[in-house]
Amino acid sequence: MLKGIHPAISPDLLKILAEMGHGDELVLSDAHFPAHQLHHKVVRADGISINSLLTGIAPLFEFDTYTEAPLIMMQAVEGDSLDPAVEQSYLQTIKSAVGNVPKLARMDRFAFYERAKQAYAVVITGETAKYGNIIIKKGVTPVK
């Protein structure tokens, strides 16, 4: 065990977070996301919500400030609707952890899948919220 690491962050996920460079993206997917079809590097976080993972990741992760929106979520398919509480809960979780909220953008379902293919890794969570997937983009970690 390490001090200060949230219990939702597995050793495999901690390794991935440390390996990622600036500009790399991480997909936090819901339980139904086709991760293994889209990507070769998949970590399982079964039974863990995306909010729990964001609580653990945000203090360890510098969100990209060189891109317009370092957070990306899927937009609703035509004729379907989003629950705005899902996005708001993610943003509030990040704000609580780091004090500010990076900008969030939405993209079409299939564009999101294509973007996920280019990510550093995909984390399959226990999240069941509709359109609950989120991509987070890592920035440059400041040297202190």
From Swiss-Prot:
Keyword line: Carbohydrate metabolism, Cytoplasm, Fucose metabolism, Isomerase
GO terms for MF: fucose binding; L-fucose mutarotase activity
Residues reported in the UniProt entry to bind substrate: 30, 109, 131-133
E.C. no: 5.1.3.29
Principal cellular location given in the protein's record: cytoplasm
Subcellular location: Cytoplasm
Annotated Gene Ontology cellular component terms: cytoplasm
Reactions catalysed: alpha-L-fucose = beta-L-fucose
InterPro entries, sorted: L-fucose_mutarotase, RbsD-like_sf, RbsD/FucU_mutarotase, RbsD_FucU
Pathways involved: Carbohydrate metabolism; L-fucose metabolism
Entry function: Involved in the anomeric conversion of L-fucose.
NCBIfam families per record: PRK15420.1
Protein name, UniProt field: L-fucose mutarotase
Chain's gene name: fucU
